[in-house]
Amino acid sequence: METLRFAKVRDVKSPERGTAKSAGIDFFVPNDFFTTQLAPGDDLLIPSGIKVNIPEGYMLMGADKSGVATSKQAVVDTGRKPKEGAFMSPIVIGAKIIDEDFQGELHIHLINAGNFPVTIKPGVKIAQFILVPVDYCALEEVPADKLFTEVTERGPGCFGSTNIKGLINQSRSDRV
């Protein structure tokens, strides 16, 4: 098991796992961060107050907190009463990769992907980071016609192409 060494450089709660088997390590909004309203479509970089020494051969990958808006310590205040079981948070994490050779303070990139403003509050869980092994593969440029040695079942299909595979040979009226 690797150890992720960290240092606090601001007044912030130490990163922690929700449970012993949680993949993600929870990060908090620093206590000295001003309460901030984030408008729909806007983004924000929050200094985490944490520097990390990422072990050799690893990276940190940022991820959204699935329970952020449903927890009692909600990170966002939407001003709306949540529906039973609804996930209210429109906050997503951007700029997710932290390379092993980065030595500065981590910043958390928040994006309001919703259609209403949210309020970011100090002291609450905002994101999680996962320690992920990295394969530093070699890069080799080859001519496009030499790139693949066999044709796969998927081929050059794009996003969602496996869902429409059976529709390709149907007329439009047959698909409706």
Segments predicted by a language model, with ranges:
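DUTPase catalytic domain/fold
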Residues: 1-176
